[in-house]
Amino acid sequence: MKPRPFKEEFTLEERAKESAAMIASYPDRIPVIVEKFSRSNLPEMEKRKYLVPCNMPVGQFIFILRSRLHLSPGTALFVFVNNTLPQTAQLMGSVYESYKDEGDGFLYLCYSSEKTFG
C-alpha cells in the first residue's frame, strides 16, 4: 500500500508545530521531508523525515538517500525541490532558505529515477 503524502497525513498546524520544535531543539539542522515521485519505479523510503545539517552539500544528502534505498550503482537517482534539480555542491541550508514551505517550515524533496517531470 502506498503511503499518503506527508501533507495529507498531518494537518498544517501539526506540521508547523513539529518543524518548529525540531528547529528549536536542533538549530544547526533543517527539517526535510523526502517522498517518492508518484510515477517513479524506485522503492519507497522506510523513513521520509530527516534532520539534515545546514552545512551538508546536496550531493552528500543524495548519497545518503541512495544508501537508504539500497540502489545498485547503475540506478539513477534524481532529487527535486519545487520541480527543479538543486546543484549537488549547494548546501542544504541554502536550499532550505530558498525552498522551504512557508506554511509548515519543512523542506520537501521528491526523488525519482527520471531526470524530468511530466
From Swiss-Prot:
Q: Which key words tag this protein in UniProt?
A: Autophagy, Cytoplasm, Cytoplasmic vesicle, Cytoskeleton, Lipoprotein, Membrane, Microtubule, Protein transport, Transport, Ubl conjugation pathway, Vacuole
Report any Pfam family annotated for this entry: ATG8
Q: Which Gene3D superfamilies match?
A: Phosphatidylinositol 3-kinase Catalytic Subunit, Chain A, domain 1 (3.10.20.90)
GO molecular function terms noted in the UniProt entry: phosphatidylethanolamine binding
Q: Where is the lipid attached (Phosphatidylethanolamine amidated glycine)?
A: 118
| Subcellular locations according to the entry | Cytoplasmic vesicle, Autophagosome membrane; Vacuole membrane; Cytoplasm, Cytoskeleton
GO CC entries:
autophagosome membrane; cytoplasmic vesicle; microtubule
Bilayer topology: Lipid-anchor
Q: Which BP terms from GO are recorded?
A: autophagosome assembly; autophagosome maturation; cellular response to nitrogen starvation; mitophagy; protein transport
What processing steps or modifications follow its translation?
Answer: The C-terminal Gly is amidated with phosphatidylethanolamine by an activating system similar to that for ubiquitin.
Q: Does the keyword Lipoprotein apply?
A: yes
Segments traversing the membrane = none
Question: Its quaternary structure?
Answer: Interacts with ATG4.
Family statement drawn from the similarity comment of this UniProt entry: Belongs to the ATG8 family.
Q: What is known about what this protein does?
A: Ubiquitin-like modifier involved in autophagosomes formation. May mediate the delivery of the autophagosomes to the vacuole via the microtubule cytoskeleton.
Q: What is this protein called?
A: Autophagy-related protein 8D
Q: Which organism is it from?
A: Oryza sativa subsp. japonica
Gene name in the database record: ATG8D
